[in-house]
């Protein structure tokens, strides 16, 4: 039995998240079905993390154990022949030690969020982006983003259903940058709570749109009160960009 690591990318628009669900289409479900067609036996995959319904991935990491005699390049081609029509693509395959786990060995994760901030755009440019009508002040947004850097209790920005024992997370980078008609928010952290990134984004945007003080964001973060967080930003504009390992 060989452990294989796969770098994958996907459009999460039509899926009910990564984690398998019995009656709904998921990323894990589609990949495991594709592996079963090739392996002729059930294959369970493990991931670096579970993206929510509608969230995309530029580079997600998964592993699986398989016991068939096939070259990795041919396995990649066979999987993509099945998966590409379902908006999932295998970018890379390689063998890993049996002790490796994509989630528990991960050191950091990077997410990005696309905000369409222009009135002059084509309809398709709003796909995989969150449209904000008001012209946003990147300087204000970045001042709020700096507040996130370091180790904090993110209870305020956690989902009520999140069962994590600790709500503390370490944020290494958080910044906004202009890219044409878009404003991109990038964040790197040790890991993230369920819907944490979208809750942070939604709160920062609401404060900026309403011209509230930047200190309001810090007060909300330190409150550890979920009820003070603003509307959670839509999932369609969120991407898992990269997972970091030693």
Swiss-Prot record:
The catalytic activity of this protein is classed by the Enzyme Commission as 5.4.99.12
Going by the UniProt record, its keywords in alphabetical order are: Isomerase, tRNA processing
Family matches, as InterPro entries: PsdUridine_synth_cat_dom_sf (IPR020103), PsdUridine_synth_TruA (IPR001406), PsdUridine_synth_TruA_a/b_dom (IPR020097), PsdUridine_synth_TruA_C (IPR020095), TruA/RsuA/RluB/E/F_N (IPR020094)
What biological function has been recorded for the protein in this entry? Formation of pseudouridine at positions 38, 39 and 40 in the anticodon stem and loop of transfer RNAs.
Query: Is-annotated flag, keyword Isomerase?
Result: yes
Provide the binding site for substrate: 111
An example GO BP is: tRNA pseudouridine synthesis
Record keyword Cell membrane present: no
Supply the gene name. Answer: truA
Q: What is this protein called?
A: tRNA pseudouridine synthase A
GO terms, molecular function: RNA binding; tRNA pseudouridine(38-40) synthase activity
User: What species is this protein from?
Assistant: Borrelia garinii subsp. bavariensis (strain ATCC BAA-2496 / DSM 23469 / PBi)
- Please state what class of enzyme this protein is: isomerase
Q: Which HAMAP family match?
A: TruA
Subunit field text: Homodimer.
